[in-house]
């Protein structure tokens, strides 16, 4: 950490669900000599999310006003440099998943462009992220096949195929075995075990992550593997749980999913000071048999490349370590060949994405969507409702905040903006749902998920009052609705829990994903057009966005709620 072997100011001791602060030097050798120990260097990235082009510091599109950082050409160059620099310390490059989704590059070019650049970086092992399922197993299968042809293994110990037809020929082992410097190393892949609830996994489900890691690690130990790495796409908090409850045989966890920036308290290494530090790099967690398991993660979007060097004794126990997340700032050179390789892909993206479809006079915000009503969500919901509106019928619209990925700035709105705003490829489905179920959906939107986030509904045709001072599942104070049989009236009346209402929702939501199980109680459902087409058509119809009626979702406390 911060380049000093064995240093860490703080560890998180995770036992059951209690975090205890302790000195990281506990049980560390007084003698810092590592000459008799076996070094293993882990170079790792996670949650790239299609950031092939350079980005600004916020990991959005880099403009002429910005100082550009990251980008696949810089990431490639830095990984190549680190592999060479630590050649004598047995370097292994790992990719912890979620390479799909996040920019127009993926939305237009899908697995093809992703596989092309992953092949060039060629990790020793990869695991899957939840976003690799964004276009169902059918959209994942050719990606896996392409990587497999290049000898790049994708490993997931807790993947349950359930005879999914699209993945039946895909090779996804639980782990791989490597011989590095005459030492036998096992790498176990694991994916967040609720992925089938938040992604379009088809028949595929995920078994308990802790149990899967424990079981596979024990099997590797029986096969005389003495160093075991867990390559996890489960989140920082879940990785702590894995270390505490399944850490008897594992040695280190390389993580992903939560986009966590880990950075040691006294490190002098370059970084973006605006990046919130969630814990030290590495974070140490004590297992049930009192072993300390290091956990690392390298934030997201190619902004950092992690580098951790571990030192093992003859028994395969970690005795020392050093490393830090390497900041991929503007000073990092871009690999010239990768820059050339980007050119033909960029031409395809620009040809489709640059078409202007409208204009906005206000910023269409995405960052606040999870906690409250947001301008992007309101406009999107209005577009959904408009899709099915006629002279005598105007349905409501409900969209979950997690549907949105990128804001739209003031100015021209391009086809690229439309797709990047909500890039998941849902359809705009018309459903019929009972009032009581709508109430349940609203309650769930302000119940925290596993990452401690709300999922505020973005709505059209409704007014919802949320009192966040109340207990979870008792926060909805009031829901009022417009008369969907009279499109010209803006009058609101109380929701009737016994009545049925017509609502337009993303197909993802209609399927009950993100925990919105009440949606599956719909008594009728009509599959609609692609959501991005609906949004595009609505923007083209209104031409200019300059006035949105807000106040549809009121988030308040106690006496301030009306």
Swiss-Prot record:
The UniProt record describes its induction as: (Microbial infection) Dengue virus infection does not affect expression levels.
Tell me the null mutant phenotype. (Microbial infection) RNAi-mediated knockdown does not affect dengue virus type 2 replication in salivary glands after infection.
Q: Which domain of life is it from?
A: Eukaryota
Provide the residue positions that the database annotates as binding a divalent metal cation 1: 47, 49, 98
Query: Which transformation does this protein catalyse, written as a reaction?
Result: a ribonucleoside 5'-triphosphate + 2 H2O = a ribonucleoside 5'-phosphate + 2 phosphate + 2 H(+)
Q: Which residues are glycosylated?
A: 112, 390
Q: Which InterPro entries match?
A: 5'-Nucleotdase_C, 5'-Nucleotdase_C_sf, 5'-Nucleotdase_CS, 5_nucleotidase/apyrase, Calcineurin-like_PHP_ApaH, Metallo-depent_PP-like
Q: Where in the cell is it found?
A: Secreted
Where does the secretion signal sit in this chain? 1-24
Keyword hit for Cytoplasm:
no
One annotated GO biological process: AMP catabolic process
| List of residues binding AMP | 370, 405, 424, 514
Single annotated GO MF:
metal ion binding
What the entry lists under PANTHER family is as follows:
5'-NUCLEOTIDASE-RELATED, APYRASE-LIKE PROTEIN
**What is the name of the protein in this document?**
Apyrase
């Amino acid at each position: 950490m911060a380049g000093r072997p064995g240093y860490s100011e703080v560890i998180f001791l995770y036992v059951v669900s209690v975090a205890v602060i302790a000195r990281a030097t506990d049980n560390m050798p007084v003698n810092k000599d590592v000459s008799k120990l076996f070094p293993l260097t882990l170079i790792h990235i996670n949650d790239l999310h299609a950031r092939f082009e350079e980005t600004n510091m916020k990991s959005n599109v880099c403009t002429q006003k910005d100082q550009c950082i990251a980008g696949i050409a810089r990431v490639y160059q830095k990984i190549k440099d680190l592999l060479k620099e630590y050649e004598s310390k047995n370097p292994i490059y790992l990719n912890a998943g979620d390479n799909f989704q996040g920019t127009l590059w993926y939305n237009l070019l899908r697995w093809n462009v992703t596989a092309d650049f992953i092949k060039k970086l060629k990790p020793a092992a990869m695991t899957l992220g939840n976003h690799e399922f964004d276009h169902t197993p059918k959209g994942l299968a050719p990606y896996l096949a392409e990587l497999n042809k290049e000898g790049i293994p994708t490993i997931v110990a807790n993947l349950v195929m359930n005879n999914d037809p699209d993945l039946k020929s895909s090779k996804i082992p639980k782990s791989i075995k490597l011989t590095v410097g005459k030492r036998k190393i096992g790498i176990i892949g694991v994916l967040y075990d609720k992925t089938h609830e938040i992604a379009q996994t088809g028949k595929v489900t995920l078994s308990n992550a802790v149990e899967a890691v424990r079981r596979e690690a024990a099997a590797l130990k029986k096969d005389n593997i003495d160093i075991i790495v867990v390559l996890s796409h489960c989140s920082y908090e879940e990785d702590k749980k894995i270390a505490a409850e399944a850490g008897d045989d594992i040695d280190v966890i390389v993580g992903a999913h939560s986009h966590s920036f880990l950075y040691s308290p006294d490190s002098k290494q370059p970084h973006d000071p605006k990046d919130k530090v969630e814990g030290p790099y590495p974070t140490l967690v004590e297992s049930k048999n009192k072993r300390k398991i290091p956990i690392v993660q390298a934030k997201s979007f190619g902004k950092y490349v992690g580098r951790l060097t571990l030192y093992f004794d003859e028994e395969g126990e970690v005795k020392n370590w050093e490393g830090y997340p390497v900041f991929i700032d503007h000073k990092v050179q871009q690999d010239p060949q990768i820059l050339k390789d980007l050119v033909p892909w960029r031409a395809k993206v620009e040809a489709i994405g640059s078409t202007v479809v409208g204009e906005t006079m206000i910023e269409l915000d995405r960052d606040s969507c999870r906690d409250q009503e947001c301008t992007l969500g309101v406009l999107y919901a209005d577009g959904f409702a408009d899709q099915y509106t006629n002279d005598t019928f105007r349905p409501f619209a409900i969209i979950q905040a997690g549907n949105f990925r990128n804001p739209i700035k003031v100015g021209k709105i391009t086809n690229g903006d439309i797709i990047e705003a909500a890039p998941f490829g849902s359809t705009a489905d018309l459903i019929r749902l009972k009032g009581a179920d709508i109430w349940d959906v609203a309650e769930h939107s302000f119940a925290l998920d596993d990452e401690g986030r709300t999922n505020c509904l973005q709505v059209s045709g409704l007014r919802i009052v949320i009192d966040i001072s109340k207990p979870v599942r008792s926060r909805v104070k009031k829901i009022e609705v417009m008369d969907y049989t009279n499109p010209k009236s803006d009058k609101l009346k109380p929701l009737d829990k016994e009545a049925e209402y017509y609502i337009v929702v993303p197909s993802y939501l209609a399927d009950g994903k993100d925990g919105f199980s009440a949606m599956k109680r719909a008594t009728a459902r009509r599959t609609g057009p692609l959501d991005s087409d609906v949004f595009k058509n609505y923007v083209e119809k209104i031409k200019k966005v300059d006035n949105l009626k807000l106040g549809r979702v009121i988030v308040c406390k106690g006496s301030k709620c009306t």
